[in-house]
Amino acid sequence: MIFIRIIRNYFFKLGHVVCARTVKNFAKSEQFISKPGPRSIGNILLADKICDGKLFVFGNIFELGDKVIWDHSLSSIENYEELHGFPWLDDLAARGDKAAVEIVQKWVFSWIEKYGSGSGPGWTPRLTSRRLIRLIHHEDTILNGLSEKYISTYFKSIYKHANFISKRFYKTDKLTMNFEAIVGVISVSYTHLRAHETA
């Protein structure tokens, strides 16, 4: 029984990898019809530590220095994969000042550059849905003052996330209810996307 479960989980993960790398990221729209707005609450005290170059994660302090989080070797951190669900985005968005916004933008777009093509440990239905929900909730913070190039990159990533979840949320261990993956799909469906209007 255990062996069968291991084999099944292996093929689930393999399927996630293949899907993440092949799913389309072409976004026909660059705007939400309904303004999503933040619905998750962060911790300003944790954001303060991040702005000071320290990440409080799973009971430990991780020294960031001046580097973007994804430039560090994170495998030594227990459950480091959870960072790919972007829990820190809630905290930084709650603080919301210039320093926090700059970190948000650096971390989000460096993640997209490094892992957005479908690589890394973050492409599971659970983590992808958590990440997608937060990316949608904190759109204003992420895109604050950025150019059309970054806006386009953001919406392409949103499209890829939603496309991945729609194909993979049911391909998971039946013992783990993937409620968040379903919520991720609903979030995109609810907010909708429409073609960006140009003058």
Q: For each of these PLM feature ranges, what is it?
A:
Residues H192-A199:
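Single conserved hydrophobic/aromatic residue that forms the stacking wall/gate
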Residues M1-D173, F179-I186:
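Extracellular glycan-targeting catalytic surfaces
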